[in-house]
Amino acid sequence: MSFVAYEELIKEGDTAILSLGHGAMVAVRVQRGAQTQTRHGVLRHSVDLIGRPFGSKVTCGRGGWVYVLHPTPELWTLNLPHRTQILYSTDIALITMMLELRPGSVVCESGTGSGSVSHAIIRTIAPTGHLHTVEFHQQRAEKAREEFQEHRVGRWVTVRTQDVCRSGFGVSHVADAVFLDIPSPWEAVGHAWDALKVEGGRFCSFSPCIEQVQRTCQALAARGFSELSTLEVLPQVYNVRTVSLPPPDLGTGTDGPAGSDTSPFRSGTPMKEAVGHTGYLTFATKTPG
């Protein structure tokens, strides 16, 4: 099992995502002889998981069932152990697009945190790219390194434990893109410039507060970055349903009551509950010269 390439059968050591129904999911490490307790009953790894195809519908001890899903960065984001606040797929999708990531890209990232963005970047740049990720917190860095090995993506990522604002990314002029998710990204703008290739590259920082964005933009402009832009992603979910209304009175002037016929049509209305503010994404370009 790898987060980069699909494999058909579940093996010992794999990470599997158990879909329990109604949006409930849990990630498990498959180990021979181990058991996982679910609300549908016990799941025995040796009998119920190992050797079965991903996507299987497995019956648990109480007669209920779960689907065993192949892990993806999107599913991992929803089920990972939170060591920090994380970014979700809505923001991550825009980041990977605006940074123009593709197979073969070299990316520098800080901080690693819980690894949500890291897994998505690795999947995008594999099989010939590489991620240099920096985390100042020793235990978080060690846990991220361990997870990358468990998920069999370690060959595409180098984890460094240092303060990116003081020590940079540990590489120079190799990156096609830089992503920052740290409290003071403006302090790392100079190191981001040095990490990007001489011929140029893309920059992105995530900040929850507009004051952080202002200071970052000032630092970017002072360092020579161009094409600065800041975006906020606010998805709106619509409820589509069939509505039946009487035909409109077009003023024909006919006497008598209006007809009882109704005209059904499909209507889309925004849901009352909407996703709120997560943060601002600031993008910039290092141009050669």
Curated annotation (Swiss-Prot):
Q: Name one GO molecular function term.
A: mRNA (adenine-N1-)-methyltransferase activity
What's an example Gene Ontology biological process for this entry? Answer: tRNA methylation
Q: Which residues carry this modification: N-acetylserine?
A: S2
Which reaction does this enzyme catalyse, per its entry?
adenosine(58) in tRNA + S-adenosyl-L-methionine = N(1)-methyladenosine(58) in tRNA + S-adenosyl-L-homocysteine + H(+); an adenosine in mRNA + S-adenosyl-L-methionine = an N(1)-methyladenosine in mRNA + S-adenosyl-L-homocysteine + H(+)
GO cellular-component terms in the record?
nucleoplasm; nucleus; tRNA (m1A) methyltransferase complex
Q: Which residues bind substrate?
A: 20-22, 35-42, 64-65, 85-89, 110-117, 180-183, 205-212, 278
Q: Where is this region: Disordered?
A: 245-272
Query: What keywords are assigned to this protein?
Result: Acetylation, Methyltransferase, Nucleus, Phosphoprotein, S-adenosyl-L-methionine, Transferase, tRNA processing
Indicate which residues the UniProt annotation says bind S-adenosyl-L-methionine. Answer: L87, S114, G115, S116, E135, R140, D163, V164, D181
InterPro entries hit by this protein: SAM-dependent_MTases_sf (IPR029063), TRM61_C (IPR049470), tRNA_MeTrfase_Gcd14 (IPR014816)
Tell me the compartments it is located in. Nucleus
Q: Which Pfam families match?
A: GCD14 (PF08704)
Q: Where is the composition biased (Low complexity)?
A: 250-259
Q: What is its EC number?
A: 2.1.1.220, 2.1.1.-
Assembly behavior: Heterotetramer; composed of two copies of TRMT6 and two copies of TRMT61A.
The UniProt function text for this chain reads: Catalytic subunit of tRNA (adenine-N(1)-)-methyltransferase, which catalyzes the formation of N(1)-methyladenine at position 58 (m1A58) in initiator methionyl-tRNA. Catalytic subunit of mRNA N(1)-methyltransferase complex, which mediates methylation of adenosine residues at the N(1) position of a small subset of mRNAs: N(1) methylation takes place in tRNA T-loop-like structures of mRNAs and is only present at low stoichiometries.
Family statement drawn from the similarity comment of this UniProt entry: Belongs to the class I-like SAM-binding methyltransferase superfamily. TRM61 family.
What name appears for this protein in its UniProt entry?
A: tRNA (adenine(58)-N(1))-methyltransferase catalytic subunit TRMT61A
UniProt gene name? TRMT61A
